[in-house]
Amino acid sequence: MSLKSTLFRSALLTLHKSGLHSLSPPSLSGVGIVFMLHRVRPAPEHDGFAPNALLEITPEYLNAVLTTVSALNYDLVSMDEAHRRLQQRRFDRKFAVFTMDDGYKDNLAFAAPIFAKHRAPFTVYLSSGMPDGTLDLWWMGLEAAIRAQSTLDWRWS
């Protein structure tokens, strides 16, 4: 488990086990949580320039999050079920919803098996240009081009 995963899990468990979460007023505790994710894939081999890394988590991290959320007794539910609970004002149990934005292939390759292992539904919001290959992933190309340079000369004009 990575340091980031360990810290996140430890923070959630510390709040829960210490009871510190109970000091906040009920109006702030919420009835559920929605995790909005983008990419789930193994950590890249490079340590260079990677501004898009903040939109990525590793499969191990996702597994740790699902394990922790389940240990905190959240129901892992679909977006439809979360909507139903909110409409019916069913707040007896907290819920967690997971969404994947954009529809990267790694959602299927790396995230789906982990969600299946935890029996956790998830919703993929698919960018229309992903399936047919018409979406220009310019931000990934720009990142790779900059990372490949030993120096970058930029002049503001």
Enumerate the predicted regions with their spans.
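Terminal accessory/targeting
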Residues: 1-98, 105-157
